[in-house]
């Protein structure tokens, strides 16, 4: 069979069925991601003055870290100062 015939026949066939079951919706993916995080980490919700939030975001940007990573480093640093 020539390549042109092969190309025509392969593209005209039905698409292969998804083999791993039904794909998850974006909401389901997000829910599973949060569940995995909750298994290992504790959630902290805080309200900051806008100037402190801007400082936090600046630190994150400069260091290339997430907010969680910056806050963890700050807490560790303060804990060492206090001998906790």
Swiss-Prot record:
Q: What is the lineage of its organism?
A: Bacteria, Pseudomonadati, Pseudomonadota, Gammaproteobacteria, Enterobacterales
- Say which species the protein is native to: Escherichia coli O157:H7
Q: Name one GO biological process term.
A: plasmid maintenance
**GO molecular function list:** DNA binding
Q: Which gene encodes it?
A: repA2
- Give the start-end ranges of region Disordered: 1-31
Q: Any idea what this protein is called?
A: Replication regulatory protein repA2
What does this gene product do?
This protein is involved in the determination of copy number in gene replication. It binds to the repA promoter thus inhibiting the synthesis of the mRNA for the initiator protein repA.
Q: Which UniProt keywords apply?
A: DNA-binding, Plasmid, Plasmid copy control, Repressor, Transcription, Transcription regulation
Q: Which Pfam families match?
A: RepB-RCR_reg
NCBIfam families reported for this sequence? PRK13702.1
Spans of biased composition, class Polar residues?
1-13
């Amino acid at each position: 069979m020539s390549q042109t015939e092969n190309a025509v026949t392969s593209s005209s066939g039905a698409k292969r069925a998804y083999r791993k079951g039904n794909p998850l919706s974006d909401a389901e993916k997000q829910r599973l991601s949060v569940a995995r995080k909750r298994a290992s980490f504790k959630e902290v919700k805080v309200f900051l003055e806008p100037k402190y939030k801007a400082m936090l975001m600046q630190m994150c940007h400069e260091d290339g870290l997430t907010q969680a990573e910056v806050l963890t480093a700050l807490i560790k640093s303060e804990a060492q100062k206090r001998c906790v």
